[in-house]
Amino acid sequence: ICPPTGCSDWDYTTEVKARVPSGRFDSTATQYPSFTANGATVDSFPYVYTPTWSYFLNVNTGNSDSIQNLLTRIYIFGDSLNPTVPTDSDFVFPAGYYNYIYTSGVVTDSIFVNYSGIYQQDFITVYSVFEVIEDFELGRMMTPYANGFALTWGRDYWYDVTDLIPVLKDTLTVRILYSGYSDGFSANITFYFIEGTAPRTPIRARIIYPLKYYEYGITTNPIENYLVPKTFPIDVNETQASIRVIPSGHSFGGASNCAEFCQKNYRWSVDGVNRFTQLVWRNDCGLNPLWAQPGTWLYDRSNWCPGDKALTRNHELTPFITPGNPVTLDMGFDAYNYTGGAGFNPGYILSTQLITYGPMNFQVNAAMDQIVAPNNEFEYSRVNPICDKPIVVIKNLGATPLTSCDIVYGIKGGTLATYSWTGNLAFNATATVNLPSITWGSSTGNQSRFEAWVTNPNNTVDQYTYDDTLRSSLTFTPMLPTQFALLWKTNNAFNETTYQLLNSSGTVLYSNGALAGNTVYRDTFNLVPGCYTLKIVDSGKDGLSFFANNDGTGYARLVNTVGSATIIKLFQADFGTSITYNFTVGFSTSLEEKLKSAVFNLSPNPTSGIVNINLILPKMEDVTISVMNQLGQVVYSEKRSNFQQDLFDINLENQPAGMYFVNVNTPSGKLTEKLIIQ
């Protein structure tokens, strides 16, 4: 969330980690002086108890002059158990040095100032014992380019930390570490405890390599110096295991732009045999739900995107361990030689954990893992709202491969549908399922709840039903007129951007023809009642406008074809990879055609008196437009019969400055907008 001073301009790493006492102890050695002279630590201090003098050259006479030395206070530290507390003190004059005799500016002789004693430094070494704290990273995200974000901006990031139950107990510290230099962002953490039984019970969680930044490609100090083989004991009751990894590459320069913008693999060998290879990369930053950030948000990166999570990678180790025998793990990276050019040495932040478990708790356990659509959650906003086929993700959390299940789904309180899925999912594997369409009009209201659950896995009884069901809140799609137009302008990279208008069967009804650069196109759509999807795709993944290229600026908007070309929908030009816009024509996805799907805009607002009203209703009906002041008095009113859409002005120049309410009343409902007259 943004702090009161505003969010940071830059993308910075933010780590959420549990600081877990390890039960192991270490120490640090600190040297303390046996004495100090006027608070300073010196190797030795010759002294006498009678005043001494220091000679110096008098530049006016060219001869020697002198000044009496000040007393020096000696503090003596003789207690090794309390090395900073003085045990004695002394007042002495400095001695043991030469005074030089000057004649006419020239040194002609010297006199040694004898000392009667000398304090000789004898440092006391004190060992401070401490318990080693291990940092178990729960999750990592990168802050967005947030210059100009509203102070109310905030976003939730969810992490499943079930595997870390063995360390998330007793007393520990949870730290959120923001690596930026400005006020940056505020953050908080909430743990949700879900009652039930895990698919397999975690027994131990151990750090493989410490959580830190590992420089990459430095020939004089290669990453392999730190990622050395590590051996871990495996108890007889630890029958399963996995490796949990969160990698993210940072810094860039040179030909390869490593490690932030280069595609490199890491590997895990188990007992000397390579078992896992993983590309450290995200190729979907242009589909970031937090789009149009004022920075290079759309560039694909090394396992992260600005404003999103660094992905957690899990590797199933069970086939390669033997309970009761130790296992040796070794991580490595593709060879790379950094030759310079980056702001700082490239590298990877690595979190690596070994998780061991007991046996599987269920043989047959199908789970509903995600509802992608319909869903109002921000992370799914690129594909929502929808008016057609729901999308869910199912997961196998049983020991037996999942080959079939039934998915029951629909709007809560409405008509439910059932879909029979078949496939082959191993334990922990997922499948994205595009479900057949439902009866959207079986619910009331503009917002509702969608629910989906799995049942009948492998044609048998699910042994654990508490993870079968998920619910989501949803918003119904807008309803557009039967005829409207796509008004769009290409940029210089005209061959990158295309559009398609599809019906609910996936048939392409309209698409762009041959294009030219920096040209405005107006394509008119005539549609029958139904559900539709407009897809605008940019193969360069940089939309119709992006500050960091030379493609220029285009735009895309939906406009009315009846009357003046008022805007129905204005699309963000800095959209990255694609835009998906779902809508209906001729019917609303709720039971009644609610006015909340209408278009109702006032401009300018504030106004000096003349107000332009853009009003589009879902269907033709009688309408009353009225204006009310803050006292509840109607100061303007007009009626229109058989009205559906128009762009018109009303004159309120005779009204005093203040706040007003513009009301639209129809048999289907009421719309209200605030208006300020200056």
Label for each model-derived stretch:
Residues 414-444:
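Intrinsically disordered, low-complexity Pro/Gly/Ser/Thr-rich segments with frequent PxxP/GP/PP motifs
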Residues 1-366, 372-376, 382-386, 397-400, ...:
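Extracellular/secretory-pathway and virion-surface proteins
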Residues 592-603, 607-678:
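C-terminal outer-membrane/trafficking sorting elements
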Residues 440-478:
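Terminal connector regions
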